[in-house]
A protein has these predicted regions:
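Polar, glycine-rich mid-to-C-terminal structural blocks
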Residues: 1-17, 22
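Acidic/polar-rich alpha-helix caps and helix-coil junctions
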Residues: 27-210
């Protein structure tokens, strides 16, 4: 494969397994998509779709060396806006303005009112905020905490929601939740065996064998 990302042979491409459905969820006018991913196919027949991530690869200096000078992301302004959207939705308020402020920056010169979100039901708003976070915070370690924290209209974690997940590349018409309700214990991590052995008073997280 050619060095399309200009990595200078230092680390290779970030070929994490991001689903095509996530790529497809971006509008063509949303500049985050092409700033985050590079799409590629396995053949001229457009088969074997895949995406390589372009985030966090740094830059090349005058000595032709790759420097990882990307800031370590903790919280960004877009995160604050979407937190506010989440809070407003929880309080039965209006969240669309916060979502649209994030989108306006993301679309830049491509922005058009047709891309604006209009407030809907609690469940619709919650899913919209989640999917906006999905597109905004790729590779930033937030997705799992988002789906566990956020809820549907019945107060159930979005980790159990089919609508919150993306279909697999191999079965694009089949949608399943991230976690089955029969495996609800997976919302919490198990305690590793070394820690349990070192402290006999510890008890394993319910749902896992000790």
């Amino acid at each position: 494969m050619q060095d399309t990302l200009d990595l200078k042979g230092t680390v290779g491409q970030f070929l994490h397994e991001y689903k095509k459905a996530l790529w497809d969820s971006y509008d063509d006018e949303d500049m985050r998509r092409d700033a985050t991913f590079m799409d590629h196919y396995g053949s001229a027949q457009k088969e074997g779709f895949g995406i390589a991530m372009k985030k966090g690869i740094g830059s090349v200096n005058s000595n032709n060396q790759r420097i990882f000078d990307t800031d370590i992301i903790v919280y960004r302004y877009a995160d604050v806006l979407l937190m506010m959207a989440e809070i407003e939705n929880a309080l039965s308020g209006k969240c669309a303005n916060y979502v649209n402020e994030v989108r306006k920056r993301a679309y830049g010169k491509n922005w058009h009112p047709q891309f604006a979100y209009t407030d809907g039901s609690y469940a619709d708003n919650e899913l919209t905020i989640l999917h906006e976070r999905d597109k905004e915070f790729v590779w930033e370690g937030k997705r799992w905490f988002d789906v566990v924290r956020m809820h549907d209209a019945n107060g159930k974690s979005l980790a159990f929601s089919v609508a919150a997940n993306y279909p697999n590349n191999e079965t694009p018409d089949e949608r399943v939740p991230l976690i089955k309700e029969s495996e609800a214990h997976k919302l919490l991590w198990p305690i590793d065996v070394n820690t349990l052995n070192n402290d006999p008073k510890l008890e394993q997280t319910p749902g896992y064998d000790k």
